[in-house]
Amino acid sequence: MAAKIIDGKTIAQQVRSEVAVKVKARTAAGKRAPGLAVVLVGSNPASQIYVGSKRKACEEVGFVSRSYDLPETTTEAELLELIDTLNADEVIDGILVQLPLPAGIDNVKVLERIAPDKDVDGFHPYNVGRLCQRAPRLRPCTPRGIVTLLERYNIDTYGLNAVVIGASNIVGRPMSMELLLAGCTTTVTHRFTKNLRQHVENADLLIVAVGKPGFIPGEWIKEGAIVVDVGINRLENGKVVGDVVYEDAAARASYITPVPGGVGPMTVATLIQNTLQACEEYHDVEEA
């Protein structure tokens, strides 16, 4: 069996185009364009690339894009003060603070300071809690993007055995909640999991997010499984690969996401979706 490729680039472009149409309709009706503030602290090269792609996507869909590039020496108090200012700014619908933050700044404190109605990354306890209670509003970007991919490929998830490899706050944990909402029987594995291979071999739908190149061998994949590879790993030779041995897995799976070009583009597209949603669901009411 040769797997069908789940093309994240194409779906992400569709999502962005749909948002652009809605933004154009808003402005034509005399409403303001949604606004996103992107905050980068320090000069981490990978973070600069991610932030650049987010800002570019904002401009493409017609958002107001605000950039705040702060020096490595920025204190936690200074960053919190900026967030307070942005929380009160009526032009801004979404606030994104690029992680990781420099040493000495508490990630949790910073993310919790963002107003839940401007938390377009979906990391605030309020938004995570709503997802857990089956009443999601702003949802974490990567898990929501993965659900969008499955939906756009008309993959019926109800009743599937879904296995999530990795239990991070950004992907693994919220992904497990999304999969429960999607009707899956869901297992989350982590560094203490025994018999990992057995779990993988049982998966109808496998989501891998550990950040280790080739962590899951292709021969572990169940015949006909759907494989979603969240990993983005750059090898010494410059090649970018996922957490799954792609060629071997693709020979057994029914669907698979490539790396690059699978999940990555969806994370940015979902951030754009979330910003429009925050504008429409939370901030339009205040304008009325």
Curated annotation (Swiss-Prot):
GO terms for biological process: L-histidine biosynthetic process; methionine biosynthetic process; purine nucleotide biosynthetic process; tetrahydrofolate interconversion. It comes from the Bacteria. Pathway: One-carbon metabolism; tetrahydrofolate interconversion. GO terms for cellular component: cytosol. One of its GO terms (molecular function) is methylenetetrahydrofolate dehydrogenase (NADP+) activity. CDD domains: NAD_bind_m-THF_DH_Cyclohyd. Gene3D superfamilies: Leucine Dehydrogenase, chain A, domain 1, NAD(P)-binding Rossmann-like Domain. SUPFAM superfamilies: Aminoacid dehydrogenase-like, N-terminal domain, NAD(P)-binding Rossmann-fold domains. It holds the Pfam family THF_DHG_CYH_C. Keywords: Amino-acid biosynthesis, Histidine biosynthesis, Hydrolase, Methionine biosynthesis, Multifunctional enzyme, NADP, One-carbon metabolism, Oxidoreductase, Purine biosynthesis. The keyword NADP applies. It catalyses: (6R)-5,10-methylene-5,6,7,8-tetrahydrofolate + NADP(+) = (6R)-5,10-methenyltetrahydrofolate + NADPH; (6R)-5,10-methenyltetrahydrofolate + H2O = (6R)-10-formyltetrahydrofolate + H(+). Homodimer. Catalyzes the oxidation of 5,10-methylenetetrahydrofolate to 5,10-methenyltetrahydrofolate and then the hydrolysis of 5,10-methenyltetrahydrofolate to 10-formyltetrahydrofolate. Belongs to the tetrahydrofolate dehydrogenase/cyclohydrolase family. This is Bifunctional protein FolD. It comes from Enterobacter sp. (strain 638). The gene is folD.
